[in-house]
Design a protein with these regions (language model features):
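S-adenosylmethionine
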Residues: 1-225
Length: 225
């Protein structure tokens, strides 16, 4: 479908849902495939964090840091289930209903008063981070991040983990993901969280460094006891 619009792509070698575009990148948003919801723009590493969710999803699914909705769309496509999308900044999700409609995804955008404690079988948290895993294609990010901003991000990530964990029902799963390669934002956050609670266990952890095939990323899957 992309080739009809002069866009040349090939399958990604390790992420089954991803395509590597070698020609016509700027044409994608004007292509028929994009406008009828056959393709979305997303780094392969972001897709990989969803594809590796080899877990049982018993109960509603919540994308807790939905932003523009990339992960919500990926979750919907992979799990083929309705997705609840939430973001502390509701305005960030303004385009999500149209994106969901275009792709045929069943995504319901919700506000904070719609959230329910101990209710969701899966809560996915793609938390705000330094973005260090994507500095290969956005090197200015490395120089614009101040120490104060970084420390603020660490506190925010810790708070998101604490809040999101209360929304997961017993035997449910919590996914913590970043596009960072810095330990403080990744493994250290999970270790701190597990140290302060007896209700959770680490099921899976994955770290990937940046390469020509995708950004660096981290994710962990936690299970509530």
């Amino acid at each position: 479908a992309l080739e009809k619009d002069g866009i040349i792509s090939k399958s990604h070698p390790t992420v089954s849902t991803a395509l590597i575009v070698s020609k016509g990148t700027r044409k994608i948003k004007k292509s028929q495939a994009y406008n009828i919801g056959l393709v979305e723009l997303q780094d392969a590493s972001s897709q990989a964090s969803v594809l590796k969710l080899n877990i049982d999803q018993n109960g509603p699914i919540l994308d807790f840091c939905a932003g523009g909705g990339g992960k919500s769309l990926a979750l919907s496509a992979y799990l083929n289930k309705p997705i609840f999308a939430y973001d502390a900044n509701f305005e960030r999700m303004k385009d999500l209903p149209n994106r969901a409609c275009r792709s045929g995804a069943n995504i319901r955008v919700i506000k904070s008063n719609d959230l329910k404690k101990s209710h969701y079988g899966l809560v996915f948290c793609d938390v705000p981070c330094s973005g260090s895993g994507s500095w290969r294609r956005d090197p200015e990010g490395k120089w614009s991040l101040t120490l104060q901003d970084y420390e603020r991000l660490l506190t925010l990530q810790e708070n998101i983990l604490a809040t999101a964990s209360q929304l997961v029902k017993p035997n449910g799963n919590l996914v913590y993901a970043t596009c960072s390669i810095l330990k403080d934002e990744n493994k250290a956050q999970i270790q701190k969280f597990l140290k302060n609670t007896n209700d959770w266990a680490l099921k899976k952890e994955k770290f990937s460094i940046p390469s020509e095939l995708g950004d660096g990323f981290y994710f962990s899957i936690l299970k509530r006891k």
